[in-house]
């Protein structure tokens, strides 16, 4: 009997021990679940189930491009800091495959910065569009709006198209380039630069990474800005362009830019990722000017980068991430989100870096130029100046640019 009692006591103790272990495990799981819910609150609280967080696929230029991609990642980092949302950055050559994998892994918000939309919007190889396969995932694309049917209606309610009014910012850059080119001898110390003067120097170059709406939108706006000022001043310019520069070969960018500089161009604008680094370096070498893009890169080659046309992807990435956190994706789903000069997501830099090179004698003329730029900006905002927007489907008509020759377009 005593042995039976001992056995029963042992069994009761064992049961209590096991019960305590499982209770401890249960508490641990609850704790882990609560911790993850810092980033994935339930919809009953007014915020969305964020799943694993937000995914972002970079463009070919990669995450360390000092511009387009890096700015977008900064938006995600801000969303993580301010809103508690985790994120994943993917660098890939297989955009459709990565979109599918990420959506399949539970990501409900995916940004894709590469100009590659067919598999997402139309479907390829007999497959349904990825957007249709994953209707509960929002896909955000940039620099074009392919998410429309022939009648203008929206194809997929879970696709967001982000457009920057870089055509307007590029117009400003073109106007600035012409004003500076016409007054270079008054603005700068001749010992610091080797500008080509007179008609021989009334030439400008443009390097684009690809012949796509997301790139031509810069070139066309730039050309129109040059023509606008050239017409006002009664002079004629030549616009050299190459839309096959790619995005990674900086040495090739330097070589191509040098052909423009050697032919008399004083300013070359590059919209081509790392190719622009080569253009900037060549501008410094030959003592002329370049124009950069995406982020404020004026200080990369101080005094040789005239300005940068800004495409601040941080602004829309953070805004959309906040809607995601607030369970308010209905505000953006299926829509085209456009960011103009006033939004802070596009424009040109404040010119403070190049301004340090303006001579004392050139200060009055420089202030006059900045005043002219302000007037032009106001006219764009009011609609008095209309700039071709290739991203929105506007057709570019170079025959309307009476003061600009475009031999390559």
List each language-model region with its residue ranges.
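Bacterial N-terminal signal peptides that target proteins for export
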Residues: 1-12
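Bacterial signal peptide processing site
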Residues: 26-29
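A residue-level marker of the well-folded mature domains of exported/periplasmic proteins
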Residues: 32, 36-409
């Amino acid at each position: 009997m005593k042995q039976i009692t001992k056995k029963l006591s042992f069994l009761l103790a064992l049961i209590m021990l096991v019960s305590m272990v499982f209770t401890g495990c249960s508490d641990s799981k609850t704790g882990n679940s609560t911790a993850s819910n810092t980033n994935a609150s339930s919809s009953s609280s007014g915020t969305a189930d964020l799943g694993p967080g937000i995914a972002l696929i970079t463009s070919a230029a990669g995450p360390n491009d000092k511009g387009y991609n890096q700015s977008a990642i900064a938006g995600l980092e801000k969303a993580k800091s301010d809103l508690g949302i985790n994120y994943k950055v993917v660098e890939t050559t297989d955009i459709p495959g990565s979109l599918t994998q990420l959506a399949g892994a539970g990501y409900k918000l995916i940004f894709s910065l590469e100009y590659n939309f067919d598999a997402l919007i139309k479907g390829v190889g007999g497959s349904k569009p990825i957007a249709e396969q994953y209707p509960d995932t929002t896909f955000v694309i940039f620099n074009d709006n392919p998410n429309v049917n022939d009648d203008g209606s929206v194809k997929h309610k879970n696709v967001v198209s982000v457009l920057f009014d870089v055509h307007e910012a590029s117009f400003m850059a073109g106007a600035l380039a012409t004003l500076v080119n016409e007054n270079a001898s008054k603005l700068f110390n001749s010992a610091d630069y080797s500008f080509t003067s007179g008609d021989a120097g009334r030439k400008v170059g443009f390097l684009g990474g690809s012949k796509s709406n997301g790139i031509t939108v810069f070139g066309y706006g730039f050309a129109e800005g040059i023509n606008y000022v050239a017409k006002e001043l009664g002079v004629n310019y030549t616009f050299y362009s190459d839309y096959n520069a790619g995005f990674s070969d900086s040495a090739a960018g330097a070589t191509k830019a040098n052909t423009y500089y050697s032919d008399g161009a004083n300013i070359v604008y590059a919209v081509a990722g790392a190719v622009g680094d080569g253009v900037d370096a060549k501008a410094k070498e030959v003592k002329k000017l370049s124009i950069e893009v995406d982020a404020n890169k004026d200080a990369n080659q101080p005094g040789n980068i005239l300005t940068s046309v800004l495409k601040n992807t941080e602004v829309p990435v953070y805004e959309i991430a906040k809607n995601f956190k607030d369970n308010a994706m209905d505000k953006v789903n299926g829509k085209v989100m456009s960011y103009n000069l006033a939004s802070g997501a596009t424009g040109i830099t404040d010119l403070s870096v190049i301004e340090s090179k303006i001579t004392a004698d050139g200060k009055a003329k420089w202030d006059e130029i900045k005043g002219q730029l302000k007037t032009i900006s106001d006219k764009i905002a009011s609609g008095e100046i209309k700039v071709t927007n290739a991203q929105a489907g506007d057709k570019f008509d170079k025959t309307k640019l009476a003061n600009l020759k475009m031999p390559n377009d």
